Regions:
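Short alpha-helical segment within the catalytic ATP-binding CA
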Residues: 1-2, 143
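Short, hydrophobic alpha-helix immediately C-terminal to the catalytic nucleophile
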Residues: 4-8, 123, 153
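Conserved alpha/beta-hydrolase catalytic His-Asp/Glu region
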Residues: 19, 28-30, 45-104
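Glycosyltransferase donor-binding loop in the core domain
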Residues: 87, 114, 141-144
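Short beta-strand/loop motif that positions the catalytic acidic residue
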Residues: 102, 108-110, 114
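Catalytic active-site module of serine/aspartate enzymes centered on a nucleophile-bearing elbow/loop
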Residues: 131-163
Length: 163
């Protein structure tokens, strides 16, 4: 979302753009999941195509050590506060009015099973950005760079190689 905003505001300063499962637009019939009201288990099930996969379990396991657990909670609180400042109550801060300014090659990467920001948003970004390419990664949720790293890196490398 922030990258798209910067690209729309400063298109002459940006050579290329990659948006991964990005917020920034709003589709009334396909709302973005309110990430802030989710329990830890709901978050695990919604972030990943398979909430029981090795990466999902690794990323959602809470450490036994109280100091480590406290540090994770502090980091999560800071992260959610920062995200909340930019993304809510509605993750549409007017980008749709500026998106026509994004004129650089743009890669849009989405998981086909993104339950946080559905792939409908990838299609909308693709429709609104002139020089964009949408890649939807199969059997993948909201975090393709972690859930499908090979496919993610292949898409990024192909994109960079083509510009």
């Amino acid at each position: 979302m922030i990258a798209a905003e910067l690209a729309a505001c400063f298109p002459n300063k940006i050579k290329s753009l990659s948006l991964i499962s990005s917020l920034g637009l709003w589709i009334e019939s396909s709302p973005v999941t309110d990430f802030f009201i989710l329990t830890a288990d709901e978050r695990k099930q919604l972030l990943w195509h398979n909430g029981e996969s090795e990466i999902a379990i690794k990323k959602s396991t809470v450490p036994e050590d109280p100091s480590e657990r406290a540090l994770i909670n502090v980091n999560r609180t800071i992260t959610l506060a920062a995200i909340g400042k930019f993304c809510w109550p509605i993750p549409d801060k007017g980008l749709k009015k500026r998106i026509h300014r994004i004129n650089m090659p743009t890669l849009l990467l989405w998981g086909d099973d993104d339950k946080i920001v559905p792939s409908d948003y990838g299609q909308l970004f693709n429709d609104l950005i002139t020089h964009s390419k949408l890649i939807i990664i199969p059997e993948c949720g909201h975090i393709p760079q972690l859930e499908k790293p090979q496919e993610f890196l292949s898409a990024i490398n192909d994109f960079i190689g083509a510009i």
